[in-house]
Amino acid sequence: ATKGEQVAKSPVSRVLRVTADGKRYYVKRYLGNGKNAVRRWFGLRGLVAPQRVVKEWKNLLLFRKWGIPTATLVGYGLEHLERLATASDPCLRDRRWMAQVLRQVANITRTLHAAGFAHNDLKWRNLLVDGGGSPTVYLIDCPSGGMWWGVFLKYRIIKDLACLDKVAKYQLSRSQRLRFYLDYTGQRRLGVEDKQRIRKILAFFEGRE
């Protein structure tokens, strides 16, 4: 957890003054939405961010775009899926919510691979998701990604899908995982090549976990 001097307080948030590398920063830490005690963060990472937090940082960015003096945002974001999994967040048990998230992850992954790009570390921790009834997934943190071709691309695609499944196999049902794969391929049912690829995905991390 971020530590610093508390300079402001409300029923749902705290503002901390933090010094790092000789520079002073202010971090707004959300404690909840007023109805529960689930901790949420603004400026750093936390659990699923409430819509008011997202709106707040977007407004600050708009103010700066319009030339209105405001604090410079040096960090803002939502939470990665892996934290939700390790915290056993109830969102993961909401099948409708998860269906929306998985559909977006499938679309993101398909778009990357269709362009010949492999993420190379496509794990849940590199996917941010906001809250609300209509969640939005954001892809972050891709220092190892790059363009590939031929058999090299095919291998990297298997790796990307295996990275996603590394947590999914413990958090999702078999039907959810199958639905994700079908959304990724844009198909209604599995073909022979799909079954071969799935076997490679499942075997990718065998003996390495």
Question: Could you describe each region identified by the protein language model?
Answer:
Residues 1-85, 104, 110-115, 119:
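Conserved ATP-binding subdomain of kinase catalytic cores across diverse folds
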Residues 25, 69, 136-138, 162:
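Protein kinase-like catalytic core scaffold
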Residues 34-51, 88-90, 152, 178, ...:
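Alpha-helical membrane-targeting segments
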Residues 122-129:
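Hydrophobic residue at the +6 position relative to the catalytic HRD Asp in the kinase catalytic loop
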Residues 88-101:
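Activation segment of protein kinase catalytic domains, centered on the conserved DFG
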Residues 17, 129-131:
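Conserved hydrophobic "DFG−1" position in protein kinase catalytic cores
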Residues 138-207:
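C-lobe/activation-segment region of protein kinase-like
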